[in-house]
């Protein structure tokens, strides 16, 4: 029994040095899962995969450093565009629509500040949730690799 306990403790410690559990507390989910296994050692970014990252430039909605889970919709070298109808495309492929959080705001202000296009730089990733209500790169712009905490795997 003592050796089994030692093995269990060792495995637990090894698990905690690589993984942690993340829970999305939002009422309206922006991803398909609420609970995630986060591999904090895996920061190799792949398009379409989900990652936990520390947000920047999202104030006053979220303080800098708040962790979020979103999927990678755009990689370095990809062309991101948000048109006047608020369609969001990456390399010409539609990946989302709208600015749900800006409803009721002055439409001129929204179009001036939230439309346009850009080529993602060497260390820039366009992160998006799966819901139009997701607060993501549409609002705070690209995420850099230094902000990424680990790859997220949906559990349930």
Locate the predicted segments by residue.
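Mid-length scaffold segments of soluble, non-membrane domains
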Residues: 63-97
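Short, surface-exposed secondary-structure boundary micro-motifs
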Residues: 41, 56, 85, 93, ...
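A short, sequence-level motif marking secondary-structure junctions
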Residues: 43, 73, 96-106
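Acidic/glycine-rich C-terminal interaction modules and beta/coil loop segments
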Residues: 24, 98, 104-152
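Residue-level recognition of short, solvent-exposed, well-ordered loop/turn junctions
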Residues: 46, 75, 83, 120-122, ...
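Solvent-exposed loop/turn segments at secondary-structure junctions
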Residues: 43, 58-59, 80, 88, ...
């Amino acid at each position: 029994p003592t050796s089994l306990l030692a093995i269990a403790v060792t495995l637990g410690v090894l698990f905690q040095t690589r993984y942690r559990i993340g829970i999305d507390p939002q009422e309206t989910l922006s991803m398909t899962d609420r609970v995630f296994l986060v591999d904090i050692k895996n920061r190799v970014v792949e398009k379409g995969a989900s990652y936990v990252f520390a947000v920047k430039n999202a104030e006053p909605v979220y303080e800098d450093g708040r962790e979020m889970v979103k999927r990678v919709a755009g990689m370095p070298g990809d062309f991101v565009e948000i048109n006047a109808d608020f369609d969001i495309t990456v390399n010409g492929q539609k990946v989302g629509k709208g600015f749900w959080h800006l409803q009721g705001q002055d439409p001129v202000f929204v179009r001036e500040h939230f439309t346009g296009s850009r080529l993602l730089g060497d260390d820039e990733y366009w992160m998006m949730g799966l819901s139009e209500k997701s607060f993501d790169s549409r609002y705070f712009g690209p995420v850099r690799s230094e902000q990424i905490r680990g790859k997220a795997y949906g559990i349930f």
